Amino acid sequence: MKKSVRLLGCVLVLFCLLTGPVFAAAYRPFPDNRSISEVFDSIKVDGSYDRTRIRLITANDEAFYSRWKMVEDARETIDCTYCIIEKDIFGQSFIGLFVKKARQGVSIRLMIDGRVYRMPYMSKMPDKIEELAAFPNVQIKLYNSIRKSLVSVFTDYKKIVASNHDKIIICDGLVSIIGGRNIGADYFAQNGENDIVYNDSDVLMQGRHVAGQLKKAFDDEWKFNRNLVVKADAINFKDQLAKVELAYRVMTRYMQGGGLFDPEKVTDGKLKEALIEMNKEISAFKNISSYAAFQMFRGEREKPVKILDKHSHTGPLNGITPALIRMIEASRHEIIIQNPYLVITEAAEAALKRAADRGVSIIFHTNSAESTDSLFPQAFLMNDWKRLLQTMPTARIFVAPSQNERLHAKMFVFDGTIAVVGSYNMDPLSEDLNSEVVAAIHDKAFAQMTRLRILRLIEKKNIEYRIEVDERGKIIKTYGPEDHVNEKTVKKMNFMRKLQWLRPLI
């Protein structure tokens, strides 16, 4: 017995020695910063301000479970807006879930971005969504429909490309979720299960005041006069309702650990074909079969939370960019920015440079050309990264080296005190063109947890871009995109980064 205890003790000591430096490097206590607390206090929100039960979700399976469960549990109302609802098994089953809730009498408002809705890769999905629109308790709109926005082509072309980039679900005016994820396999699968797998982040919240703030953000975009109401087909040549309801049943059974339905028991030939295809698709996702044990909240406590909203280019409100810049200005110790696209605006860069001049540590975590889903932001980062490190000597830039580490999360941490999580990217597209929404959480424990998750992701397998300067500040050595990105892609980016007139649209 004593020998076993001694052996266990040696193992624990060895574990601490091996893991201790990593945890010690990642964890950093921060002194109170009154200035940054004052920034949070100065943010005005509609209605009464109170504390919110909140959970940070970074695991892809839990992100899907959260959305599914809150919609499944809804009894009265569902407000939902997404830029993309994919035509894969995740998107189809989600529409099938909405059909179920519509049959139960739940009032549903669904908004989808008008630019994505008619894309070729979304073929047949509009027909399925139009089936949902046939229910009298369901309203569906396309945000800033191209058909209606074309009137701006000669007056303000930016209004044509302005998108609703919010990702919001609000159920029964109580439970809500926002973040970076759309509805599709890319956001909920694990590495090796899908061609594209994102590292992303959401916040799941419970509280009527925050739900009310998000409803205000939703309503602002819902009322936009260039939205197009989606109506059911007057003549329905192909009934898509049975297919989305089948997708719902397939997903529910699989998530509960029940495996697949037997196609041989389906008598309808078209549905049998659809089931075979769905079984083949869902079988690839090995890590979404533990829904039965999932709990939305696991002892998370209430935190001070405020919603920051921003209209698209078609509206006047921008509550995000100025607040983030004020948080940068108020930081005294550390700023962490995790974002898939690092095309920093002049105002943000100036604020970050002033922070660096104060000695504030700045950590950027973003994509590289090898991991990104959009090459233009990486081309412009090629123009910027050396200057950023040269003018901000306290800054470090870490990039995801391959598609296995592809980043889509949008998180900020200021002095280990305030965390910001949502849909906002560090690029002109979010700053000027698209609607966005984020949650600002003023709580050291939550901010430290957010910080640690970012640093853990960086520690896994990321590349650091570096420069060395001489005594006069001249760059004499670098390690950057040209050192790890394939030559063909570098040539392409070298051409793209010359197109500076496109930068405001990236």
Locations of regions flagged by a protein language model:
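Secondary-structure "cap/kink" motif recognition
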Residues: 70-75, 102, 325-333
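Bacterial N-terminal signal peptides that target proteins for export
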Residues: 1-9
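Bacterial N-terminal signal peptides
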Residues: 9-19
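PLD/PLD-like phosphodiesterase catalytic module centered on the HKD motif
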Residues: 23-55, 63, 104-175, 185, ...
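Active-site cores of enzymes that catalyze phosphoryl transfer or operate on phosphate-rich substrates
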Residues: 52-55, 251-319
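Non-catalytic, alpha-helical, charged scaffold/linker segments
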Residues: 207-209, 213-260
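Phosphate/adenylate-binding glycine loop and adjacent helical scaffold
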Residues: 78
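A short acidic, amphipathic alpha-helical/loop segment
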Residues: 69, 93-97, 326, 347-354
